[in-house]
Amino acid sequence: MRVTNIYFSKIIKLENRLREFNFRKLPNTENKYHVDVTDDRGQRIMFTMYPDAEHMWHISASEVPQWIYYAQNILGQLIENETSSGVSN
């Protein structure tokens, strides 16, 4: 059995700043992704994203900055685009 590590990075503009989001598919899950990004002070923020039955992506974290919640749909679309293209680093 071969295990494939699926990961990719995307840069998007949020709150007038370019931010690099790193995505990594969690092993042994069908559709969960670990996501991390740095805040304005350089501290890494980590959270998990998963789709619901209607394929809407959600953030699974107790506390993340509001700007990440605002980007939830954008981040979900980035995951969908990347996985549908079949291309990863």
Give the residues covered by each predicted segment.
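Acidic, low-complexity intrinsically disordered segments
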Residues: N5, Q43-N89
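Exposed beta-strand and adjacent loop surfaces of beta-rich binding modules
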Residues: Y7-S9, K32-H34, R44
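Short, charged low-complexity linear motifs
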Residues: R19, R41-R44
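Residue-level recognition of conserved beta-strand positions in structured domain cores
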Residues: F23, V35-V37, A61
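Short, surface-exposed, low-complexity cationic segments
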Residues: N28-D39
